[in-house]
Amino acid sequence: MNKITKIETFTGWNLRKLWRILEILESNKSIALISDAGLPGINDPGQELVHAAKLNSCEVICIPGPCAATTALVISGLPSERFCFEGFLPKKQSLRKKRLEDISQENRTTVIYESPHQLIKLLEDLSISCGKERPIQIARELTKRYEESIGKTIEQVTKYFLENKPKGEFTIVLGGNSNKKKNRMSESDALNKLNILIKQGEKSNVAARKIAEESGYEKKWLYSKLHK
């Protein structure tokens, strides 16, 4: 009679279970870390387990499997020789704002994960920080029956998902900042310049248009900041 292999869930942040697994490894036994969604360890609690195993001099072997980040990157048509992986962006507003500013300056292709109920918000944030014309591809249901890849620009995909309710988990592949000569103006600098023009007597809509052309931020967004 075949011995049944014990299966346990590992969701991270469980020190008791983590130490029990390490004890198994240190007793010269093996375990397999598997996932029902993507490659274990990539935006996954498995990373915590692998880190602990390496710290305790346990051998770790990876059998390559599917990964949404690289799969979406390959089919995006965007440059893939150099790219950066962001996973899910921070939820805390201050950290999220800083991360978005960093992404807006990034010359490499960037890969981001997002849930369906937060996708529109992410696209709106990317439109503000990166500009609505930044190239983008959004993939869902990768390697499955209803696989879908949508994209060209942030503006176009935002319009698409406003008309078609987002479903499934999304992998966003964002083109890099092609402006190599000059970095995009920071949000605070753009708003400071806008306020200076207003104080100098420039009309609000004219000032917003000028700073939009100079900074890359949308005129509508800049104008809205004047009335908050």
Language-model features and meaning:
Residues E48-E106:
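Class I SAM-dependent methyltransferase SAM-binding "motif I" and its flanking Rossmann-like core
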Residues M1-C62, T70-T71:
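Class I S-adenosyl-L-methionine
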Residues I7-L15, P66, G87-K92, E141-T143:
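Short, acidic/turn-prone active-site loops that include or flank metal/cofactor-
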Residues S35, C62-G65, I112, I138:
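General beta-strand structural signal in soluble alpha/beta enzymes
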Residues N2-T5, V50-H51, S76-E81, S129-C130, ...:
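Short, hinge-like loop/turn segments at secondary-structure boundaries
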Residues K29-S30, T109, P116-K228:
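A contiguous loop/helix-start segment that scaffolds small-molecule binding in enzyme catalytic cores
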